From Swiss-Prot:
Tagged with keyword Amino-acid biosynthesis: yes
Classification via SUPFAM superfamilies: Ribulose-phoshate binding barrel (SSF51366)
Name the record gives this protein: N-(5'-phosphoribosyl)anthranilate isomerase
One of the Pfam families matching this protein, by short name: PRAI
EC number: 5.3.1.24
Protein source organism: Synechococcus sp. (strain JA-3-3Ab)
Taxon lineage: Bacteria, Bacillati, Cyanobacteriota, Cyanophyceae, Synechococcales
Underlying gene: trpF
Catalytic activity annotation: N-(5-phospho-beta-D-ribosyl)anthranilate = 1-(2-carboxyphenylamino)-1-deoxy-D-ribulose 5-phosphate
Gene Ontology molecular function: phosphoribosylanthranilate isomerase activity
Endpoints of the signal sequence: none
Annotated pathway: Amino-acid biosynthesis; L-tryptophan biosynthesis; L-tryptophan from chorismate: step 3/5
The UniProt record lists the keyword Cytoplasm: no
InterPro entries named among the record's database cross-references: Aldolase_TIM, PRAI_dom, RibuloseP-bd_barrel, TrpF_fam
Keywords noted in UniProt: Amino-acid biosynthesis, Aromatic amino acid biosynthesis, Isomerase, Tryptophan biosynthesis
GO biological process: L-tryptophan biosynthetic process
Length: 226
């Protein structure tokens, strides 16, 4: 089928991060947003720097101060940031100047198809997009799915990740409608917020392998297309 970037997000425990990395996923995500269910305080995240180098370490932020991200990069060795707030294209561009070499993923919360129009504003200021289901109070990890058939055949200007309510049981159905560069799972592979279920992660990878998917080590470069 091709190569697929697989990110497991909302990790809070070192033992689970190491075990999930060993299963062969592409990336691990860590929530740096206070007062959210899967928040990992920086003071408890120094172990991120010891994770295997082959796995992408993605910090998830909402309308962050660039200095906060810089501290996370220094302490935890982040290799990418995922921006889930109202960050403008100019702010994303400035972040790239502030932290060269750190990949930027801009999350778009999709409520209506018209929300996809915003994707084209970010085509030259981030390396990838992430499509997530809209929720009025929460920026992610809601367990709500997108309308996959409705999104089919919509073009995006960058490599992109599909998020929103994905599980080992529905991921192949989602991929039958869409052709993302990657997928992002959180609530669909855990027992409770922040407590990942390693068997569910294993089952996810088995489902993908059964259909011929190979796990990508990195997202495509923006100029490689979708």
């Amino acid at each position: 089928m091709g190569r697929l970037f697989v990110k497991i997000c909302g990790i809070t425990r070192q033992d689970q991060a190491e075990a999930i990395a060993a299963l062969g996923v592409s990336a691990l995500g860590f929530i740096a947003v206070p007062n959210t269910p899967r928040y990992l305080p920086l003071s408890q995240a120094r172990w991120l720097a010891s994770l295997p180098r082959h796995v992408e370490k993605v910090g998830v932020f909402v309308d962050p101060d660039p200095r906060t991200i810089a501290t996370w990069v220094e302490v935890g060795g982040l290799t990418a940031v995922q921006l889930h707030g109202r960050e403008s294209p100019e702010e994303c561009r400035q972040l790239g100047e502030w932290l060269p070499g750190i990949r930027r993923i801009k999350a778009l919360r999709i409520r209506h198809l018209a929300d996809l129009e915003a994707a084209h504003l970010y085509g030259d200021c981030v390396e990838a997009l992430l499509l997530d289901a809209y929720h009025p109070q929460r920026a992610g990890g809601t367990g709500q799915t997108l309308n996959w058939p409705e999104l089919a055949h919509r073009s995006l200007p960058l490599p992109w990740l599909l998020a929103g309510g994905l599980t080992p049981d529905n991921v192949l159905q989602a991929l039958s409608h869409l052709q993302p560069s990657g997928i992002d799972l959180s609530s669909g592979v855990e027992r409770q917020p922040g407590d990942k279920d390693l068997h569910k992660v294993w089952r996810l990878l088995q489902q993908l392998e059964s259909q011929g998917w190979q796990i990508a080590s990195a997202l495509p470069q923006p100029n490689q297309g979708l």
